[in-house]
């Protein structure tokens, strides 16, 4: 009985040893290994080629600074944004070139052009007669077209003002017509207005501001906002208490 068991065990072991080996156990250099190597190399080459093509179609993302500079340098604005504009102010101008300064005794009037965003400027005389040489202003002021990058909005927050605007593949600049005191004095006591009786009144000249609607940046979108700009130089008078 034991002899028969030994014979069956030996026959079973011989059968296992004589069975063909699988591809996983094929030694290197055999045909099966060569086929697997060729297939692996082909897949690797195809993967590299696909990755290279993907990189060409989807280039590596730029740095945040480069993206920010690019967006600021060339901001494209939808023309429909200007069609919805309300509360237009003559102190806000979009132009491809610096606007001329208004001369004394003249005011600036803007003419809208439907074809382009640029506005032509014409000067016309005031309705009131020309000042005589003996007439003087209470406070001396100066006016000029300026470019603003930041401003305070109607809520008191600092906002970014758009400078260059790309509309219909043409770059425009946003100008603001500001008026301020010519020689502002930080000490109101030593800055008296012209023609005010100093025996009864303390007076000084100061620059006042008003709100105009300007094109600003809100995140990555352009939007209209009310911002403050200098618009006049006025005289402030205070009655002296010593006279009571």
Curated annotation (Swiss-Prot):
Protein species of origin: Notechis scutatus scutatus
InterPro entries in the record: Cystine-knot_cytokine, Nerve_growth_factor-like, Nerve_growth_factor-rel, Nerve_growth_factor_bsu, Nerve_growth_factor_CS, Venom_nerve_growth_factor
Disordered: annotated segments: 47-67
Residues cleaved off as propeptide: 19-125
Pfam family for this entry, one: NGF
UniProt keyword terms in alphabetical order: Cleavage on pair of basic residues, Disulfide bond, Growth factor, Lipid-binding, Metalloenzyme inhibitor, Metalloprotease inhibitor, Protease inhibitor, Secreted, Signal, Toxin
Family of this protein: Belongs to the NGF-beta family.
PANTHER family (alphabetical): BETA-NERVE GROWTH FACTOR (PTHR11589:SF10), NERVE GROWTH FACTOR NGF -RELATED (PTHR11589)
Keyword Thylakoid: no
GO-annotated cellular components: axon; dendrite; extracellular space; synaptic vesicle
Domain of life: Eukaryota
Basic and acidic residues biased stretches: 47-66
Name of the featured protein: Venom nerve growth factor 1
Function, as annotated: Nerve growth factor is important for the development and maintenance of the sympathetic and sensory nervous systems. It stimulates division and differentiation of sympathetic and embryonic sensory neurons as well as basal forebrain cholinergic neurons in the brain. Its relevance in the snake venom is not clear. However, it has been shown to inhibit metalloproteinase-dependent proteolysis of platelet glycoprotein Ib alpha, suggesting a metalloproteinase inhibition to prevent metalloprotease autodigestion and/or protection against prey proteases.
